[in-house]
Regions:
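Charged, low-complexity intrinsically disordered regions
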Residues: 3, 7-208
């Protein structure tokens, strides 16, 4: 299902996430091309988020203004199967707001030093986030080098910064989010339930 009036649906859910706050500091944000799928206790929304970037140039006594757009496809999952501590995971080449502005702290894994070569992980509850990011999840994330992820309560947000997905890539993009959700479910029983939800959601997304 596509909803061109995306802002009222999406913005209240994402307005506390860092990537939204960081983008909105520069310019108003536009949401478009919303696709949703829902089954039981799980809902996923995939949408494009864009904001204009203004460059002021001066050549001699003349000045001009160039405007281009920063765009990316974002996935947002809301599920009662998730109960996440607040965290954000960003690739090393991504520059967002300082974690100190959100009272967040760096989360490190002394037994897995290679992880820091791929990502920067922050959270309010370091021990809770560290327990959540077990070796299986860290390995999966390193194979997805470049993904950006935020979690909070029953919400999970993910994207590949500055990357717009083509229509032919959306099915894979859905799957990336569902796989992350499955790995972030805290117990094996939850993971099995989530896996069933994923299969149903993928089926509905194909039909939409």
């Amino acid at each position: 299902m596509t909803d061109t009036a995306s802002r009222p649906t999406v913005e209240p859910l994402v307005e506390e996430f860092r990537i939204y706050i960081f983008s909105k500091l520069r310019a108003p944000i536009e949401f478009k091309n919303l696709i949703t799928a829902e089954v039981d206790s799980t809902r996923i929304m995939v949408f494009d988020m864009s904001s204009p970037i203004i460059h002021h140039l001066r050549i001699g006594v003349h000045s001009c203004r160039l405007i281009n757009s920063k765009q990316q496809t974002v996935g947002l999952i809301q599920s009662s199967d998730l109960d996440l501590p607040s965290f954000d995971l960003e690739p090393l080449n991504f520059r967002s707001l300082s974690g100190n502005q959100f009272e967040q702290f760096d989360v490190k894994f002394l037994n897995d030093p290679s992880f820091k070569n791929f990502y920067r992980l922050r959270g309010n509850d370091c021990n809770g986030v560290r327990d959540l990011f077990d070796s299986q999840l860290r390995k999966h994330l390193m194979e997805l080098d470049g993904i950006y992820v935020e979690g909070k309560g029953d919400l999970l947000l993910y994207c590949f910064p500055d990357t717009m997905m083509e229509p032919s890539e959306l099915q894979t993009f859905f799957s990336v989010g569902f796989n992350l959700m499955s790995l972030l479910a805290r117990q094996d029983v939850q993971r099995e339930c989530v896996a069933n939800d994923i299969r149903e959601l993928l089926s509905k997304a194909r039909q939409a």
